Design a protein with these regions (language model features):
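Single-stranded RNA-binding surfaces
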Residues: 1-138
């Protein structure tokens, strides 16, 4: 079976089509939004680590840096980070389905043990920005 994913992006709409053996199987269309919504996933860059809060501020393209706490990294952060690191420009990416899971991160660990300023991480918006605060991430 030959699968093909076709993505068309315009200024007003994103269309994604999945074809199997040149037959359309699934079509998703989404209106472009300029805002950041809960559930959106981004590659962000760590801007500042706050050891006292055990948290970090991450640039995801929002006017204010987003906030992520150590407890929101997720137990499989190390495995996910290895996938993200292997898919950076200039690196040869391995197959995700053959990668082995890394050990879970400690429940009461330090964020600085896993993140560094300038590091690229995959994040999801858990709470939208309000007032003077940027989005909350997980």
């Amino acid at each position: 079976m030959n699968r093909e994913l076709v993505i068309n992006v315009t200024s007003s709409e994103i269309s994604i089509a999945l074809c199997e053996d040149k037959v359309l199987v699934e079509l998703n269309k989404e209106q472009c939004q300029t805002g950041f919504a809960v559930g959106d996933i981004y590659l962000g860059k760590v801007r500042k680590i706050m050891p006292g809060l055990n948290a970090a501020f991450v640039n995801i393209g929002h006017e204010k840096d987003a906030f992520i706490h150590y407890l929101d990294l997720g137990s499989q952060f190390s495995s996910l980070q290895r996938v993200v690191d292997s898919h950076q420009p200039g690196k040869r990416a391995g197959k995700v389905d053959t990668m082995k899971l890394e050990p879970s991160i400690e429940k009461q660990g330090k964020l600085a043990s896993y993140l560094q300023v300038g590091q690229t991480i995959m994040v999801q918006i858990a709470k939208e920005a309000i007032s003077t605060k940027g989005p909350r991430l997980t």
